[in-house]
Amino acid sequence: MPWVSLYPVALFDRTKAPLTGTKRYVAHFSPETSRPPVRFFWSMTLYDNDGFLVDNEFDRYLVNDRSKPKYNADGSLDIYIQPDKPANPAQARNWLPSPPATSATRGFRLITRLYGLSDKGIKGVVDGTGWHGPSLLPCAPDGSTTEGVACAS
């Protein structure tokens, strides 16, 4: 059986608003979906609307299973997407720098790369009967989300 790759793209957050540098986000994987069904590896990367990597002063361009992200006690996984580095070291480990608010008009997209999906795995991702990507939750000014997931501090 062949193993293939799939690259789901997120252009909008959970509220269907376009991704922008004026907001902070949490990409929340539930305990059931925190580990994508891949044989090889997965990664998450931000690109601007022209298709280029989102430049940042930290030279940090992805979070993946090889970067050993910090999972929550319940098995879920939160990836923090924001321009500023989280003060909490565990959150900083799961941080993906987004464009600063000054470049908000350009927006960005989140690409999740899944390497080594089986035919069954691809079908489940594509038709919605299997693994699905994270909820991309916008952070409120007080650091909360509508689904009770905490944003980075």
Locate predicted features.
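A compositional/structural signature for long, glycine/proline-rich flexible linkers
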Residues: 1-153
